[in-house]
Amino acid sequence: MDMSKTKLAYICSFRNAAADKAGQYVEYKGGRRYMKSPLEYLVEALNGTKLGAAYSLEAVIFDDDGGSARDREKVKEYGFSYQPGGLWFYPPELEVQGRRLNDLLHGVPSVYRRLPLDAADRPAGKSAFEACLQDKLLTVGAELVVVDGLLIILDELVRPGTPFHRKMVNIHPGITRLDSPHERRGAYATLDALYGARGLKVVNWATMETKPIPVVDMTGASFHYMDNGVDSGEVIVDVLNTKIGPQDTILELRWNNFSNSLFPALYQGLAQMAGMRGMLADSGAAKVRSCDEQGAMESAFWAR
């Protein structure tokens, strides 16, 4: 292994990828399109672009809990490990820099989530989980951690003075700058953007109560440092390049935003952190295809 490369770890929640239908073909404007996950995109970029000279992927860590009935239900189409002939979040034979991606998977289950929110021992359980996660990151030698779709808030792991302070970055499917009219923080970022394109703002996610607002028909993605807030860390790169149609479905918008904003933000953010300034305008080299290009390719596929 090239010791000059920065060692990457990737942390995600399979239950989030399952909600996105990662690794599946989804309905799209009367046709079908493949839902590539940010992880699969990153692997392609490491294999086929200059990012591969700067980084090596050492581990993919997921926090899903096989002992939780809720988690089992959410990932039931996939399971917690690939089974021959079954669905998976990416092509099961996928390799990254000469190694099978499936061989890099590590589960660090966030079992504290089984406890009620007001349980007295829940904070200690969360602390124990973060300690286990830190141990795993240290064991695999992680020097930079990319977080994508992790459905929990990290706290102790990202505090100043800890080994991974400012070494953990999040790729978020929305603009996270509070001063932006396109700001979409939190777990509902994509749905929030979809409502915004219809001239509505959800003011209560429990009841889905809305109020009218001026139409905001663009969204994007932010690549930012992690702190212990909700998508509140310092922004490294923003990409605002996703047009929203008022009739888009959530998966159509997800597909568009991945392709047009999130994948470029991930590429450009990692390039900037590696000091590869000349690559910042070269995210197209990572084979991010526009919606029209991808649609033409897949229409031809399904017409065969």
Name every feature range the model reports, one short phrase each.
Residues 1-304:
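One-carbon transfer enzymes
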